[in-house]
Amino acid sequence: MRIKRWVCIALASMLLCGCSPLREKNDISSLLSLEPQNSLSYGEYEPYRATLYYIDPQRNTLSTELREIELVSSVPKGKQIFEELLSGPKERGLEGFGSEYTLKNIDITGGVANIYLLTEQNLSDQKKLALCAALSNTAVDNLGVQYANLFFNEEPAYIAGRPCGLLGKTDLDMASFYESYLEKAAEPVWSIPVALYFLDESKSYILPEVRTLSFEGENYLQEILYQLSLGPEYKHYLVSPLLPNYAFTYQGNFGSIGGDGLLSIDSLQKLFQNGSEQQMRQHMACLYHSFHGVVQGLRSMEFTRGMEKHTVTFSVSQLYLGEEVLLYFPSKDLKHLERFHHVVRSGRAHNLKTYLEELAEGPLKIEQTRALPCFPADMGSEGVLGAEMRDNIAVVNFSAEMLYSLEGMQQDELYLFLYAVVNTLCEDEAVWAVQFCFEGEIIDELGIFSLAMPLYPNIGLAQ
């Protein structure tokens, strides 16, 4: 949660109000402070100030260009930002990277942006590293990630014969950055941050944990497999795809990547617990995406079950990519809010509808020892009619049935419902406060709580 932003906006918050009859008089269009903008979920356009990085040839550093763009809600934000970046600078004195690039795809998962470019340009190592740094800096500043993994023509970026691995944000001049890279590349042991992919607790999605790995020679596959077998280091809610008693040796039954990009896994029973074909694919997806960020030439992985061979490609592996969202649910004693990370399919995070649907689903089974459902017992996501952004206010429109159910809640239940919604939606950096509406209209009060104005997050309720 972005504490500094919450501290600033908390000065403007209006939390509680005295008791008075409900009055459904204020149509939302009468709120002059809520200029219609666009919707994170349903609207068409959203004004956005993008921070784009280009080369300053005078200083040989990366410099920013702030550019006002209109984001189309139906197109992923990352795609639009990087297409703007690749279109070249508009400010004088900045240098772009050429026009022969096509942005193929961007996946955002677990704080990592996987950026895929197609190009026919034959870049020098120094120019490629500068482009990678510009892409990574742009991703960190605009997409809420900590790292970027860069791919050119479906291959992970290699410079000086070594994989770049994950890049964070750099403020070095490009000459020093390149020289530092070459010095490290000349050492016998090559250490880089790598995204290792594990299963989430539900075992429905895969998520990365970033870890610095050291490679000797080209033992990329073996070292990644060994690290996966150790399990996550700090994301303890993730699960290793490998058997806990897996004994790795460098002479493991692993095979090698063929000329057609096929990696054949021979000893499946020594790697994974026996499961359904789909579970095996999910486990293989962990391996595929972990290898894919470092190893060149990988196009598919094959495993055999019984007499049948099964293939996992990039497009299959991509289906299992997840993304974390932070949700708030009432505590069992109804005295505070409990925080939980849920995993949704990559691309569904930072969407008002997704947050509300997850709240309506309630806490997971393993969370129910600490938390209660947020929504009334007789109401699910059907109680949400819509949600949109107006300036930095999330306007959530509930049904009349939801209003009726909320009116039947006890005071502490209602209080925690309101702030479970507010705190959850305000986890998105674009949302500062939440305006509650019912059938398109603002009501003055619900119980003893004022809803005439937007509610700001309550940090003190969260534990």
Language-model segments: which ranges?
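Positively charged n-region of N-terminal signal peptides that target proteins for export
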Residues: 1-5
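Bimodal "functional hotspot" detector
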Residues: 6-9, 15-463
